[in-house]
């Protein structure tokens, strides 16, 4: 009998970068404008993006993504899909039955 143990790590990474600005809002060129503090999601790459106040009154984007996992021999890396953080991959490893 084989069963699976599912585990995920909640910490990922954050980056802050430039973004186009229109009318004082973040313009990710997706047809929407986002005010400071608003979030949007990139489901394809499993990102959460937040429009933030940058240096000297500028506007920037903060991107949160999933943690990077080390290879686990004998385990399967699962990509569940969905919106961040539910889309973050995790390992399913066979559970030893004693």
Swiss-Prot record:
Tissues showing expression: Expressed by the venom gland.
User: Subcellular localization, per the record?
Assistant: Secreted
Is Secreted given among the entry's keywords?
A: yes
Q: Which Pfam families match?
A: SVWC (PF15430)
- Superkingdom of source: Eukaryota
The UniProt similarity line reads:
Belongs to the scoloptoxin-16 family.
Protein name (database record): U-scoloptoxin(16)-Er9a
Species of origin reads Ethmostigmus rubripes (Giant centipede)
Q: What taxonomic ancestry is recorded?
A: Eukaryota, Metazoa, Ecdysozoa, Arthropoda, Myriapoda
